[in-house]
Amino acid sequence: MRGRAVCSGVIDAVTVLPAAAAPHYAVVMTDRETHRIANDGLNHRLRLVWIGRRRIPGIMAGTRLRVEGMVSLRDGLPTMYNPRYEIIGIQEI
């Protein structure tokens, strides 16, 4: 499985690496709206990895993102490396 995709969702998990590890920032994003209504057996999770970065300002658990990039399957989870991203703010009522 490999292809270009545009996805949006909320960051559910952030991987913190030891200082001695090769720098990369990895998070898991879940499409919460789809997850709530879907009954298709899929988990609607996407791993995002930025190579060479220890953190990305503004991207943390709870942040809503729209991402674009190539998706491949790694360790059973769809993964996007160095995606383009847009932080989506919470709409005020």
Model-inferred region functions:
Residues 1-8, 14, 18:
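Short, glycine/small-residue-enriched coil/turn segments at secondary-structure junctions
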Residues 2, 51-68:
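Short nucleic-acid-contacting surface segments enriched for D/E, G, S/T with interspersed K/R
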Residues 5-7, 25, 65:
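Hydrophobic core residues within well-ordered beta-strands of beta-rich domains
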Residues 8, 43-47, 77-79:
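Well-ordered beta-strand positions in beta-sheet-rich domains
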Residues 14-48:
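OB-fold (S1/OB) nucleic-acid-binding surfaces
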Residues 18, 36-38, 57, 76-78, ...:
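Intrinsically disordered, low-complexity acidic/polar segments
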Residues 31, 52, 63, 71, ...:
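A short beta-strand motif that forms part of the nucleic acid-binding face
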Residues 68-93:
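OB-fold/S1-family single-stranded nucleic acid-binding modules
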